[in-house]
Structure formats: structure tokens, C-alpha cells
């Protein structure tokens, strides 16, 4: 926020210097035009969602971290239900989640931080990674059948135990659904969930989060598929009708291949001839001008509108886009600058476009001196 405010000061300072010059020159037309720019100036300061991962510790650590973020200017805090000490990227395998009681305690801790600092309308985004998480670090505490802990434990994969002779030394046993269950435990001590329970766990995560202080949901998925997202959101809205979803249009997805395969599959189901396409090779540039690729691009273009309409997505975001644009542009510039184009690679590919598009950093001293 400090840099954003400095950017405002830089832009407004330049406008006021232009205003002084226009007045000194008795140029009334230019003066009115500059005053209009000042009156309609759009600040660089925008709302920021602070991502605090899994809270970096227990609920007390989460509370302290959230306070720091809010004091720094964050209007929204995003927190996820992975374990703090073995957290993975949302699109990697091996994710481990925590029982609902642990996660809900952190949601309440964030709310307390907002309240203590006098922010009545602070936003909490509760993210669930359960769709791609096949493991849990601990068995949930349960006091009676059907409570939240019991529901969490019902997703554990394991073997029914008939007698004590079925147990080995150190085995853990859970009573669930009227039976004794020995959860499948890895050498690391982690417990495995039943296969194909991810969507059910996501739905339960989201409902309980909204019922315990969260404002928005974030469902981490393995692919950008409107039907999959809508299937989960519709189930959530059966319990919480006004549930709203934040969705990450992640660069981790191979959008081109994924949507081309979605079109391939839908066409195949419709009985259309897809014999000229190799499904696993659809990323190839050889397909770029085909009807399938054109339809896939159309679906990508309308993804945000389609997902908002059909899947209840309230806010679309894209994580780390500038990381990728910086890497790509730097790679291209290096190839051109040290290749045949030489300095023209920079001038034609960067500076000429900056000047014509009115990019403020054409004169780097304006911003480098702010740091």
C-alpha cells in the first residue's frame, strides 16, 4: 500500500505541475482539461485480499498474523484448510487437510482480529483443498454420532475390525457407523481418505465455513471445468442459498489442452467425428486453426461469464499472472536483443509500445526513485 500511495502521489504531482504550467501560460482550455483529469483521477490503491496460507501455526498464530495483515491495509483475509507445516501448492499432489474444528477455529480467529481492530465488514475467504487432498494428519475429535468430527472421520479409508486379534501393536481404531475401523495410516503417520470422496468433503467444508464466519468460498480444483464447479456449488446452496465463490483462474492449468480436450469429449459424446484429432496431442500448434481449437478458445473466452452464471462464481482472480508475463517477455527480449534484431528487439517489442500505449514507466526515474 505504501508503494501504491506513492504512485498516486507521483501521478497527481505531475498533473499539478502541468496545471501550474497551464495557468502560467494563461491557457484556460488546457487548465480545464487538467482539472478534469485531477477531479476524475483513479487511485492506484485497490482492495487487497491477503493470502495467509494455512495460518502459519495454530489459531493464536493465525490471529496474530491476520492482525498484522489488517493493520497493513488488507480488507480481506484468505485462509485454507491444509496443515500449516506440510502445506502444498493447491495444484500439487500430496496435500494434507485438517479436521473442521481446527480450521473453523482459525476462521473465528481471523474474525476476532477484524473485530478487535474495529473492522466490522472485513471479508474472510475460506479455501478448501479437499478436492485434491487424499490425506489427513489427524483423526477428528468426536463426541457423538453425526457430529462434525464424526462426519470427517466417516471419510477415512480403513478396514473393519472384528476382534482385537485383527490389530497390530500401535494400530489406531475409530468407532464409526457402529463399527470399529482401523484407518489406513502411512509410514509418515498420515491417514488416508477413501477414494472419490473429495467433492463430498468440499461440500461439507464449504457449508461449515459459511456457518462459522466465512464470507466467501474458494474451492481449489484440478481443472477449470464449469460443470464440476457448478455440481459442488449447487449442493452447497441447498444448505446456504446465498453462498458465493471466489475462483482461481490459475496459470497452473494448461488452459489450451484442457479446453480442447473438453470440446473433444463433448463432441465425441454428441456422436461427432473426432477421428482427425489425437486427444493427448491437442496442445500441438498443428491444431490451432481447426474447428475444435476455435471452439475451445471461444469457451475459454466465455469461461468467466459462464462460470459466474452457472456455478455461482462471485469473483474471478488469476494468481501470479505477472510472474509469467515477466518470464515470457524477458525470455523473448533476451533472444531478440542478443540475436539478429539487436537493440531493435527492445525498441520495437517494448519501448515503442510503451510510448504509444501511454505506459507511465516509459521514464523509469518516475518510479525507480519511489523505492
List each language-model region with its residue ranges.
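Conserved small/polar residues in nucleotide/adenosyl-binding loops
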Residues: 368-371
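Active-site proximal loops enriched in glycine and acidic residues that flank catalytic Cys/His/Asp
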Residues: 220-223, 247-251, 296, 317-321
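Short gly/pro/ser/thr-enriched loop/turn and capping motifs at secondary-structure boundaries
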Residues: 83-86, 251-255, 323-326
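Alpha/beta enzyme core
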Residues: 1-45, 54-247, 258-287, 293, ...
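C-terminal helical cap(s) of enzyme catalytic domains, especially alpha/beta-barrels
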Residues: 89, 327-341
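Substrate-binding cleft of secreted/luminal carbohydrate-active enzymes
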Residues: 304-330
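Short, basic, helix/turn surface patches
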Residues: 103-111, 243-253, 340-356
